[in-house]
C-alpha cells in the first residue's frame, strides 16, 4: 500500500518518503494561484495504475498558462507513461481562478476549471469566460479517462468544446461525486453543493 503526496515545489513522493522522479515540473506555472491543482488515483488504480493531475501549464512564448490534465503511472519511484489528455485551447492571461478539481463516477472523469479572472484578451476583457460557450474556462468538463469526449455530452452551440458538461462556474475549488444523491428538494434540505 502506498500513498502519493505532492510538495509545494511539485516533487511527488510515495508513502516511504522516497522522491519520485520524472514529472515535468518545468512545465508548471506556479505564479499566483497557479501550480499543481489536484491529483487523483483512477477508481480502478489497483488494475490500471493511472494517476491523474491537473495544473497550470506554462506557455512557451509568455507567462500565460493553459490548464492541463495529465495522467501517468508509477514505476517504483519514477513517473512513467505521462501524457496530457486534456488542455484548454486558449490561454489565461491572469494567474488566478484556475479552479481545477478532478472527480470520477462509474463511467466518466469530471474536471472543473475556473473562469481565469478577466482573462483571454487581457485585464480589460469583461468577466464573461464562465458564460462564453466557445472556450473551456469556467466550466465542468466530462470526458472518458483517456481524454476522449462522450457523444452524450450536452451540445451548447456548434462552436462549443465537446467536453462541456456544465457552464457558469467562477472558480470551483471542490468537485465530488455522490452516487446516493438522487433527489434535490428544499423540503428535504438537500443541496447540489454538498
Model-derived regions: residue spans:
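Acidic, Gly/Ser/Thr-rich repeat motifs that build Ca2+-stabilized beta-propeller blades
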Residues: 1-120, 174-194
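Extracytoplasmic, non-cytosolic globular domains
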Residues: 135-144, 163-192
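Acidic/polar, solvent-exposed loop segments in beta-strand-rich repeat domains
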Residues: 118-135, 151, 194
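Beta-propeller blade signature
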Residues: 65-78, 125-146
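Conserved loop/turn at the beginning of each blade in beta-propeller domains
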Residues: 32-33, 94-96, 133, 158, ...
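Second-shell loop/turn segments in exported
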Residues: 24-29, 124-130, 161-162
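A structural motif
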Residues: 106-113, 137, 143-151
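Short helix/loop segment immediately N-terminal to the Walker
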Residues: 124, 149-160
